[in-house]
Amino acid sequence: VLDSINHMTEEKDVQRAFDRVSLFMNPGALFVFDVNTLYKHREVLGNQTFVYDTEEVFCVWQNALDEKTDKVRITLDFFERDGKVYRRSSEHFSERAYSRECLEAMLQKAGLEVLAVYGDLTFAPPEKDCQRAVFVARKPENPEKTGE
């Protein structure tokens, strides 16, 4: 999974995805996904640059945070050794962080009930400085439970 939801940078697209997931779920089925948190986008990725230097590749990872939308524009530049020279390739994409409340509301609107939200690799609620949250939602056996 690894933050696929964050790659949808518009709420309407996330809502549409949740609606489609719900449409094809059997009653009682679970939907589990993870997201990068607001904390990670604001405090870890933010307007930071990271450099990774290995034997195979040299990578420069640059982030630009829009604080109004919590969107991070990510640019990855890879330099891969090819004999005596390096070949450069680049990737550009954006991610958006959504609040827990926003995601829970969208899941409920899609007819799903939120069973739990966990911190990354735990079965405990996410801490304030948690970088990844895991959501567990279910399509109810009785749709009236979510207000459909």
Summary of predicted features, one role per range:
Residues V1, Q15, T37:
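Residues lining hydrophobic/aromatic ligand-binding pockets adjacent to catalytic sites
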Residues S94-E148:
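C-terminal lobe and adjacent flexible extensions of AdoMet/dcAdoMet transferase-like proteins
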Residues V1-K12:
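A short SAM/SAH-binding and catalytic strip from SAM-dependent methyltransferases
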Residues V1-L2, D34, Y118:
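Short beta-strands and strand-loop turn motifs
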Residues E11, V32-M106:
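SAM-dependent methyltransferase
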Residues V14-L30:
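A short glycine-rich, Lys/Arg-flanked "PGG" loop and its adjoining helix->strand segment in the class I
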Residues H7, A17, N47, Y98-R100, ...:
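Extended, non-catalytic scaffold segments that flank or surround catalytic motifs
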